Amino acid sequence: MFKGHPKGLLAAALSNMGERFGYYIMNAVLVLFLCSKFGLGEGPAGTIYSFFYAGIYLLSLVGGLIADRTQNYKGTIKTGLVIMASGYVLLSIPILATSGNIGWLLPLTCFALFLIAFGNGLFKGNLQAIVGQMYDNFEAEAAKKGPQALAEAKDKRDSGFQIFYVFI
């Protein structure tokens, strides 16, 4: 399946799959967690969820601007992964707290959600840009070999993005 594609495609696809796995699982239980752990009603829990979800899309713009200004897409992606992982670790702290004063855990949870959204903003769009750059480089190398090789390389871009999106 990956034969004839740039070597980084597998790593990009697996990174994307891992990130989406964690994201969708967390999204599936977030409102239930907020209601059961903190005793929030559906309205306040839904508001937190809505702000988190909106933050993911708004912070993607910020992540794109940062990557464009620095021209360091790989560094931005790595930073996003570290920030997201930090958010997931912080999000696990309230799960471990079983009794006592847990009032401080709701702000911690909201901060963890912000970290996840910001890390996602740094990671998601820039990973797709890196995949596009891989194929730009792949096509440039193929162009040196002739028009037939270039045509084959251009066909690989479409199937490469198809493979990449299957891993979402």
Predicted regions and their residues:
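Cytosolic juxtamembrane N-terminal segment immediately preceding the first transmembrane helix
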Residues: 1-16, 20, 96-107
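Hydrophobic core of transmembrane alpha-helices in multi-pass small-molecule transporters
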Residues: 17, 87, 100-126
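Short amphipathic helix-loop junctions that connect adjacent transmembrane helices
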Residues: 26-45
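Central cavity-lining transmembrane alpha-helices of secondary-active solute carriers
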Residues: 47-69, 77, 81, 85, ...
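Glycine-rich segments within core transmembrane alpha-helices of 12-TM secondary carriers
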Residues: 55-56, 149-168
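Primarily marks hydrophobic transmembrane alpha-helices of the MFS/SLC 12-helix fold
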Residues: 76-77, 109, 161
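C-terminal ends and interior cores of transmembrane alpha-helices
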Residues: 79-105
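Intracellular juxtamembrane helix-capping segments at the cytosolic ends
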Residues: 122-143, 147-148
